[in-house]
Amino acid sequence: MNNSKKNNRKETNNASSRVSISWYPGHMAKTMKQLETDLKLVDVVVEILDARIPVSSQNPEAQKLIKNKKKIVVLNKSDLANEIENKKWLKYFEEKQIPAILCNSNNGEGANKIINKLNEMMSEEKNIAQQKGRNKIVRAMIIGIPNVGKSSFINRVSKKTSMRVGNKPGVTKNKQWIRLTSNVELLDTPGVLWPKIANEQTALNLAYTGTIKSDIIDEVEIAYNLVKFLIEKYRKNLIETVSYTHLT
């Protein structure tokens, strides 16, 4: 995330114990190298973020690679996030001149906006190609950390369900091109983290949202931190949801 002082949004900090995560399977290291190579094949990067944790779900290593590319942000799983916060994040990216859309991959709401966004972003290049009698194919790369819903998003936008989708981090491991229209193509890439997640709050947020495999984290500690956070910030909602009357 761009750390400029102006309008630098942050997620709620509720870390109360030292938590850091190191989970970097061999295929992720290879993916980062391949991503750097494949960037030469595309015009635009479509970055899928978890709308609940937009900052934490950005891979800082990937940001270094794509910094000179045009980018569109998809705030996925928007139905699971706070509606007011969703609007604030859209404004945040807008002020940074980064096109952003909200998407609910469960029902497809918002997914169809991506094609128009891609065409708008590449309109100048398309016009130049048209003047030369050529049809410009807009090629975009989908990137995102594990479990942000990249495959579900692509299934919605391509109206297909053939892509293997799962709720476990790291399901997609092979590179795939998907044709959306006669002049828009997407290159899907596997989800990849960075070698060491040292920031305590980032580690917790990724654990809360299922990005980190459960066998490499202390589930009891993560659960304790999450419940503590919910009690502090959403006490009334928690009571109504789980009927924990002893919390009153």
Where are these regions (language model features)?
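G-domain G4 guanine-recognition motif of GTPases
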Residues: 48-51, 74-82, 103-109, 209
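Glycine-rich phosphate-binding P-loop
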Residues: 140-159
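Post-Walker A helix-loop "phosphate-sensing" segment adjacent to the P-loop in P-loop NTPases
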Residues: 159-167
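Short coil/loop residues immediately preceding or within conserved phosphate-binding loops
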Residues: 137, 160, 175
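Canonical P-loop GTPase G-domain recognition
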Residues: 82-139
